[in-house]
């Protein structure tokens, strides 16, 4: 425990696991209950003795003895102190002394009130002041001790939460536009034109679009945002969004002003016409009509080695004649010479590679080993499957 009242060297705090406050509450409640039970027993005992003495005094008319007994009891009660701890929520803590009127409790004197003794003893006043000051000092240390009882990780989170609440910094959203792309730009130049004249022609075409003035429109998830007073958070772009889906769905449009129309100057054309398609340009330029709205959306650049159009191979199952030709070639050349099998049996078949032939042979061996009910795909005659097993066993023994 850390003594908050004395300024001495304090040992380093060792992180502990959080303790449940339920056990401490039960201990406090039991202690308070036991103190109140002792107080009630003392009050009942003295009230019973008082009743007996009142009855005896009324019968024997011995007023002198009863007065002496009262003096003794009152002196005993004045010197007895009972410390009562308040319930949770009460702030004023003090000591309560049993009054003389406690002897009057009972059915014989119901109207007598319970009053607090006003004339405190000097010793009781000093003790009560010390105890109250000690309790106040202990109350000031409760917050520090409760923080020390947290584990180290929870304590760090505790300080981070308080620091984040105290310093409210504005959150920002970062956007990066790598390139402004137009879908397609058609430029007609003669074959004898130089690279410099080609650059000049493209520059004039783009300048003709931009010189008339542009308006910027915002697109989010394919919808145009008309209200300029909306915030990014209202649109649906939070600042702490780690996913790039929202940022990728945000686009900008370059729109020419409605009051002006731009036209493109006609370049000198010589047949054959050369059509240049730029990869970094999306949109079209018309020589006679008004310029339409151009959408500006960041596009990921493809690597130089990756082709623009990758044709997907069409899966073509092997026919029975192709399977028979494959079996004949393997029987003659073996299972380890697939390039020779390709050049010997499938030389004029461009859609069959030697890897396809190797995979098909493995499939035929597996199909021949399983039962007819488990086979799938185009059925293969059983005599061909028998030849596959025989050739596979022959070349396996020879190569092994």
From Swiss-Prot:
UniProt GO MF annotations: telomeric DNA binding
Subunit structure: Homodimer.
Tissues expressing this chain: Expressed ubiquitously.
GO cellular component: nucleus
Function, in words: Binds specifically to the plant telomeric double-stranded DNA sequences. At least 4 repeats of telomeric sequences are required for binding.
Name of this protein: Telomere repeat-binding protein 6
Residue ranges constituting the HTH myb-type domain according to the UniProt record: 310-369
Key word Transcription regulation present: yes
Compartments it resides in: Nucleus
Disruption phenotype: No visible phenotype, probably due to redundancy.
Keyword terms, alphabetized: DNA-binding, Nucleus, Transcription, Transcription regulation
Gene encoding the protein: TRP6
UniProt superkingdom: Eukaryota
DNA-binding interval(s): 338-365
Domain (Ubiquitin-like) ranges: 173-252
One protein family per Pfam: Myb_DNA-binding
